[in-house]
Amino acid sequence: MASKKMEALGSVVAEALGDKLVRSTLALDELTIVCKASDLLSVAQTLRDHADLAFEQCIDVCGMDYSAYRDEPWDGPRFAAVYHLLSVKLNHRIRLRVFAEDDDFPVIPSVNGIWNAANWFEREAFDLYGIVFEGHPDLRRLLTDYGFVGHPFRKDFPLSGYVEMRYDPTQQRVIYQPVTIEPREITPRIIREENYGG
C-alpha cells in the first residue's frame, strides 16, 4: 500500500505535467513516471522548477535494455534512460523513465543543462548501452577503451566480447586481437542414486 505522501506527490506531478505524462506507477512506495523523449526537457524543467516538486538534484541516470525483460517477450521500445531525482527541500524522490524512439539508433535529449550532475551519468549510459544524449557537451566513452567495439551492457553483446588485448613482447606494446575463446556448451552430468531424496 502506497503512503499518502506518495499518492499526493503523484497527483501534483499529474497536474503539473498534464498530457506530457505518459504513465505513472506507484509501487513499493516509489513513484515512477514515463514521458516521451520529445517532451523530456520540458518535463525535467517542470520537475525542477515547480514549487511543489522542486527536484533540484539528479542523483543517478542509468541506461536500460528491455529487449529481454523478464520472462515474456518485450514489445515496446528497447532502450530507455532512467533518471532518479531528489528534492532535498521537500524530502521526496521520483524516478523518470524515457524511452528512445529508435531501437537501431537510440537518441534521448541530454538534461545536462538542467542538472549538471547528469553529465557523467549520461556518458556512462552512452558508453555501456549506446544511447546517444543529444546536446551533451562531451559525449565520449567513459569506462571502456577508446577503440572498444560495441556497448557491453546491451543484451545482445557476447559475454566474451569481440576482441581481447594482450602484451606482445616482440612489438613491446599492448595489441588487440580477435577473441580466441571457444564457446562451449556445458551440460551437467546427473547421477541419481536409488534412494536419492528419501
From Swiss-Prot:
InterPro entries assigned to the protein according to its UniProt record, in alphabetical order: NADH_DH_suC (IPR010218), NADH_quin_OxRdtase_su_C/D-like (IPR037232), NADH_UbQ_OxRdtase_30kDa_su (IPR001268), NADH_UbQ_OxRdtase_CS (IPR020396)
Top-rank lineage group of the source organism: Bacteria
Record PROSITE patterns: COMPLEX1_30K
Membrane topology type: Peripheral membrane protein
Disulfide-bond pairs as recorded: none
Subcellular location, principal: membrane
GO annotation, cellular component aspect: plasma membrane
Function according to Swiss-Prot or TrEMBL: NDH-1 shuttles electrons from NADH, via FMN and iron-sulfur (Fe-S) centers, to quinones in the respiratory chain. The immediate electron acceptor for the enzyme in this species is believed to be ubiquinone. Couples the redox reaction to proton translocation (for every two electrons transferred, four hydrogen ions are translocated across the cytoplasmic membrane), and thus conserves the redox energy in a proton gradient.
SUBUNIT field: NDH-1 is composed of 14 different subunits. Subunits NuoB, C, D, E, F, and G constitute the peripheral sector of the complex.
HAMAP family referenced in this protein's UniProt entry, alphabetically: NDH1_NuoC
Similarity remark: Belongs to the complex I 30 kDa subunit family.
Name of the protein: NADH-quinone oxidoreductase subunit C
Organism the protein comes from: Chromobacterium violaceum (strain ATCC 12472 / DSM 30191 / JCM 1249 / CCUG 213 / NBRC 12614 / NCIMB 9131 / NCTC 9757 / MK)
Gene responsible for this protein: nuoC
